[in-house]
């Protein structure tokens, strides 16, 4: 989707529409063996940018404490979990590594019914080769060790609980001589800030917040007060 579509959904909730329980942000990095290569390689928004934008939009609208955010898209390691929780996710969804633990060889036949490992098929002649007992042990081991690694990373950051992670815990090298914290690259919007006259740190919100209403997904459907600001009306 587009930034203005997210804003429209959030604005509709601030105007009395029912609140969502959670929003799942699925980045372009994710994929499926059933998708065409062009879709897997080129469609979607990068997860980091999308996650930060959704977090900032909900926070600026005063809804962040009431709506959870899930992040997904090529989550493989404990660091992926910690990084995206620090950037704004309440939890992450992982699929790829669990499929690998089951024995996926990325044959890209998921939609055909002819998965050679028996994972993505309903054909009894194929799925009977899947040893449930041994694969269950592999999945359990991966899950337990990943959570252990998450705990170690959180401890190394000097905090006791993953909920205390924030953008300051992520450091990114931009060049050979420039290193910035994630909160410098992706400034956080303050609670309810979108309803004040304070400058909006997120450039996408600054551009689209007053151009979008909760009545439409269009990018140029300004609310009356925004139109007044543009025309000098009262």
Question: What does each model-found stretch correspond to?
Answer:
Residues 1-127:
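Glycine-rich phosphate/ribose-binding loops and adjacent secondary-structure elements
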Residues 131-234:
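C-terminal extensions of enzymes
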């Amino acid at each position: 989707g587009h930034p203005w579509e997210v804003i429209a959904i959030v604005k509709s909730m601030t105007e009395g529409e029912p609140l969502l329980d959670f929003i799942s942000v699925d980045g372009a990095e994710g994929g499926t063996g059933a998708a065409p290569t062009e879709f897997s390689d080129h469609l979607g928004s990068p997860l980091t940018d999308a996650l930060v934008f959704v977090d900032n939009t909900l926070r600026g609208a005063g809804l962040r404490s009431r709506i959870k955010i899930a992040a997904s898209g090529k989550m493989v390691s404990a660091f992926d979990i910690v990084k995206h929780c620090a950037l704004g996710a309440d939890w992450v969804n992982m699929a790829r590594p669990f499929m690998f633990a089951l024995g996926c060889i990325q044959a890209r036949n998921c939609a055909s019914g002819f998965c050679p490992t028996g994972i993505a098929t309903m054909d009894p002649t194929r799925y009977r080769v899947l040893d449930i007992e041994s694969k269950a042990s592999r999945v359990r081991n991966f899950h337990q060790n990943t959570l252990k690694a998450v705990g170690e990373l959180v401890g190394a950051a000097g905090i006791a609980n993953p909920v205390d992670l924030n953008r300051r815990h992520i450091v990114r090298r931009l060049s050979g001589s420039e290193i910035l914290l994630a909160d410098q690259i992706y400034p956080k919007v303050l609670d309810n800030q979108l309803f004040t006259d304070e400058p909006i740190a997120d450039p996408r919100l600054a551009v689209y917040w007053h151009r979008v209403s909760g009545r439409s997904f269009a990018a140029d459907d300004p609310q009356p007060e925004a139109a007044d600001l543009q025309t000098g009306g009262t």
